[in-house]
Amino acid sequence: MLTAEFHPFTVVPGLRRLFLDYCSSAAAARPFYASLPSDEHWRTRPPVPAHWPQFVQLLAEQNQTPSPAAAAALEALRGGAGVIVTGQQVGLFGGPLFTPFKAATALARARQATAAGAPHAAIFWLATEDHDFAEINHVVFPARRELRTLTYATAPETSQPVGGIVLDDSITPLVEQAGELLGASDAMDALAAAWRPGHTFAEAFRQFYAKAFAAQGLLVLDAAGREFHCMGAPVLRAALERADELHQALVGRNRELEEAGYHAQVAVEPQSSLLFLIDERTGARLALKRHPASAQEPDGLWQAGRQRFSTADLLGILASEPERISPSALLRPIFQDYLLSTSAIIGGPAEVAYYAQSAVLYERILGRVTPALARFSATLVEPAIGELLRRHGLTLEKVFGESTALLAHGLAAQAIPEEGKQRLAAAGAALEAELGPLTGWMKSLDAGLGRSAETAASKMRYQMSRLRRLAANFQLQREARLGRDAEAISQAIYPGGGLQERLHGAAYYFARHGFELAEEITAEAGNPRPGHTALWL
């Protein structure tokens, strides 16, 4: 049984102001979003599109032999239930911990809407068209006193969509290494069954998460194929035929964000477009760049690699080979929500930020903007680490933002014998008691003398701080366990100077705590307040 401890997002270092204002439902963020966390109209299902029966049939074909809960979700969709969607790149062995947090949030929101009388199901969108292999080819698992990185090294020859990469025999020793780190468990069995030679990254990822969230009824979708691109062709066609209009809308939105004191998550360059082209010969995913209209080409030109195309050329490809036209990060949510008729989309801090940009595309292409909801964010505190935190009187807020060295120094300062603490405190207090009146008196005599006095006083305060550091460093040398404790806490709670959810592989926690963890995080992910939760396992 876990214990949840809620914290506002302000305890997390490095989050951008736009995301924080969105989470607090600040008035300044409202112009950029269809819905803020304080709103509830995300539960309203958009109109059922004409392609819905075909879409649900294709979804069912990808979710063959569903669990009872997934079969019930499919049946609800056939009856017109709404969709809460989330998604992620298809990372090795299930990717980082925030991946199941996304799935859990979509499931929790679908449950809430259904309980309120608006039936919904959760769909996990596999970002299989992404071509950043270096982002998905590795996973990090905690090991004894270290973090171990497992890497699938067989890179494709071109920057092709990662979902279609077929696993070769080199995956087998990686699975064996994962087994040594994770130990025997249902999760390890599921991982080994999914990640095997002959499977694609997409198939392996889908199979693992369908198993992990079988009891909750998660449906998994790969929309990279011809049928889905044909179904979503109106969105891709708009991005071709109205490229200049949509580009200017994005430029204008970026300007509005910057004028409001925010940042633009995705840069919009003069020649950038909303589309990629899959090369028919190599399979590489190439950015389509836009060249302005000219006397010779009144509709402008497009360029992918060294090849140039007219708009008519690309419309021809869309008609005959729609799977070769691929949406960018800013267009993908619109393409996705056209297919799914989405009620709400779940995203992390960066995604919520770029939804503020995509909103202008939603308005112009779909005529509506899908509400965005922040995913569940958490740190899982295992029993041994929880004991260390309690022993040293540490909270998440005290650990976040601290390097291992600074954390160790803090533990050592706490461990200084009481007599030493009292003497250091007394010396510091006495110094401050004398310096204040002295520098004030010297300043009253002469301004220049006062400035010199402040400089000298600052140096004296520095030396006092140095005495504290010397005492703490001596204590750290005497008690080596303090350094080991600091290292263990850092690797578990704030590894590599970042949140645990962004680095640790999710499979590690499923292996240690069972697939029952999926239900536990789904239950916690229903909290309507955006924030960061410590889950004490």
PLM segments and residue spans:
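Long, compositionally biased intrinsically disordered regions
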Residues: 31, 208, 212-309, 313, ...
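A glycine-rich helix N-cap at a beta->alpha junction
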Residues: 140-169
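N-terminal leader/transition segments
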Residues: 1-65, 87
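A translation/RNA-centric and nucleic-acid-associated enzymatic feature enriched
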Residues: 269-343, 349-360, 369, 376, ...
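N-terminal catalytic cores of NTP/NDP-binding nucleotidyl/phosphoryl-transfer enzymes
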Residues: 80-114, 347
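Short acidic, glycine/serine/threonine-rich loops at helix termini
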Residues: 97-98, 133-139, 232-236, 357
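Glycine-rich phosphate/pyrophosphate-binding loops
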Residues: 94-97, 110-134, 372
